[in-house]
Amino acid sequence: MTFSGFPPSAPRLYEELAAGNSKESWRLRHRAVYESDVRAPMEELAVELSAHFAEYAGGVRLLGPVRDTRMSHDKSPYKTYQGAYLDVLPALGFWVHLDREGLYASGRWYPYGGAEVARYRAAVEEEDGGAELAGITARLTGLGFTIGGDRLATRPRGVPAGHPRLELLRHRKIDAGRRLGPGPALGSAAAGAFVRETWELVRPLLDWAAARGLTPRPRGDRGADTPS
């Protein structure tokens, strides 16, 4: 079927789940709504996005609704969002999720360890590469994107306080995205267009990271750099 949006019951499910996240409430109240109003439309959206971005192998993949709580103090059994992703390279790709605040779409770089972060910081400090990334993120910010992701609260070791790209150097991960809130657009095909446009707009960011080898290298080729 063709993707035609998410009904109002979809974000409302996550509003209700935040207030009562239990296996019993899921079985009695939420599972059927999840399958019909969240999972099914997200699968339709994934098919359309996979076709549009067909140059990336593997297609868009959906996450399941159950949380892995083994290493978490929070034992709530179910996720409060429905996510889907398309990887361009390991630790680099596109993301979309639906939650109680609507739809969020982004491009993200999420390295596994210190070697990738060290290479990222070297690329940002390099004048041409750093200036290019600053320009990309400035354009995205001007289009309503938020440049988020895990980052240091202070400065990386050895970086002066007055460095022109200090904010970028603080990043250990990058998530550049924007949100479509609940409303008529979320319940129509416009939601799919929003995600496609968002992913197209973040391509330069992903291309920048891919061109500089900021994704995990084969095991025998990994450096020992450890960022601070």
Language model segments and positions:
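Long, solvent-exposed, polar/charged low-complexity segments
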Residues: 1-17, 21-23, 40-46, 53, ...
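N-terminal low-complexity, intrinsically disordered segments
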Residues: 59-62, 68-79, 84, 185-186, ...
